Amino acid sequence: MISRGSKVRILRKESYWFNQVGTIATIDQSGIRYPAVVRFENVNYSGTNTNNFALEELIEVSEVETKSKEA
């Protein structure tokens, strides 16, 4: 399941970051059209490194690593 910190591949063909991997910064739960904010290493033509995507436009590459507490 896609969650904060997950690595995702972009499927939106008209995106600057098409087929590149980014990290989920946040996921909005309010029901908006593009709830996932994805952060990238490189910037686009206007100098930004984040963009909003629909969950259907993303494929999870690797899950976020959870830290387990050892007793």
UniProtKB/Swiss-Prot annotation:
Entry keyword Plastid: yes
Annotated keywords: Chloroplast, Membrane, Photosynthesis, Photosystem I, Plastid, Thylakoid
Regions annotated as coiled coil: none
GO cellular component: chloroplast thylakoid membrane; photosystem I reaction center
Domain of life the protein comes from: Eukaryota
Subcellular location, principal: plastid
Pfam family name, one: PSI_PsaE
UniProt KW Transmembrane helix keyword: no
Topology class, membrane: Peripheral membrane protein
Compartments (UniProt record): Plastid, Chloroplast thylakoid membrane
InterPro entries: Elect_transpt_acc-like_dom_sf (IPR008990), PSI_PsaE (IPR003375)
GO biological process: photosynthesis
NCBIfam families: PRK02749.1
Family stated for the protein in its record: Belongs to the PsaE family.
Function: Stabilizes the interaction between PsaC and the PSI core, assists the docking of the ferredoxin to PSI and interacts with ferredoxin-NADP oxidoreductase.
Protein name per UniProt: Photosystem I reaction center subunit IV
Organism of this sequence: Trieres chinensis (Marine centric diatom)
